[in-house]
Amino acid sequence: MAYNCREVGRSESGPRRGTRGMEQARNYVCTECASAVPSGHKFCGACGANVPAEAQTLATRFFGALQMPGKARLIVVRGDEAMGEGLSYLLQATEHVAGREADQIPFPSDNWLSPSHANFLYRGEKLVVRDEGSLNGVYIRIRGTVPIQIGDHFMCGQQLFRVDATPKDTSGPEADQTYFYASPRRPSAFRITQVLEGGMDGIVCCAREQSVQIGREDCDINFPDDVYMSPRHARVEMSGESLALVDENSQNGTYVRIRGERELSHGDYVFLGRNLLRVEVTA
């Protein structure tokens, strides 16, 4: 027997089976007459019923907060045994305080952290970290070369340094006009001071010419036993009247202490106490 297209799944007077169902699947379905209402329409074309406002403005949702553009999280790269590496903190509120006694980002066993040490907060669409007056500061890994100034602190490997001005020459004769005999002073633009635990000064290096090189070997200041420091790790240099901190493509990076607050970007690293955190921002 021969069949034509009108005899298989279709009548001459009615629509193809399933057409109405497909229209309903593509559009809002009127709750009064079950007719399909095209997107953007405020009324049902068949019965005139109102389309609910939520159906007109229905937005697609993300599966989770991590998918939302501009939202960030912190990944613990290096932490104490209690917290563990790989732990993450999703920053989905407005402010997120980190510290030894903080609720949002707690590090209770890190005695180098202040009770409320730092705050990770959003300013518009930007993520910012703010030092909450902590004792030991907030350090951010630099990218290439950054300006610094006298009094700034920075870290290389496990070492903490401070940039100091060269003291003025106050040498002169005693009351009887006798001079104290000492090594001659070499002109120096600035000096780098190692800061020991407790705040005491350690090694002091005056700049030779216009720079001080720091590393594990063959530098102006050497730390051969610091396994986290690269052979040539970083340098501080003066150009004109300005100072700059330069990372020498070190493996573990160079970190500078922020003043007040600093904007963060995807891929930044932040040191809080003994904890190293990586910033990840959803594009």
Question: What role is predicted for each listed range?
Answer:
Residues A2-G9, S13-S109, L121, P147-D220:
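Intrinsically disordered, low-complexity acidic Ser/Thr-rich regulatory segments
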Residues L87-I150, C156, V204-R274:
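Forkhead-associated
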Residues F161-A165, L277-A283:
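Edge beta-strands of extracellular beta-sandwich domains
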